[in-house]
Amino acid sequence: MNNQQLNVFEEPLEECSCNPITGFFRSGCCETSDQDIGNHTVCALMTKEFLLFSFEKGNDLISAVPQFDFPGLKPGDKWCLCANRWLEAYEENIAPSIISRATNIRALEIITCLLYTSDAADDRLS
């Protein structure tokens, strides 16, 4: 899919995770298109708190789903999240840290606070 999509720094979008494989297109990147109604553009570092929050909202990211080759997520995994779900978690003070260079610029259509926050996960993972 990579038609040279950009990250929030207007640079080429970097890989979020290939283990587990993430992204709307399961390319490892938070690429998007008009088909991606959920806007899976935020590369985030999973936490126990966020995974439980998502589960309580009806999106079980913890349990494995073998028929979709989904191993289930655990704290420390990186995953392309829907921008709206990340924003909901942010408003509840439990948003996971983002990986800016792997977060699609289209996330900024929904999450303007990303323009103003520092990104501790980038520092820890580089």
What name fits each language-model region?
Residues 116-126:
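Single conserved hydrophobic/aromatic residue that forms the stacking wall/gate
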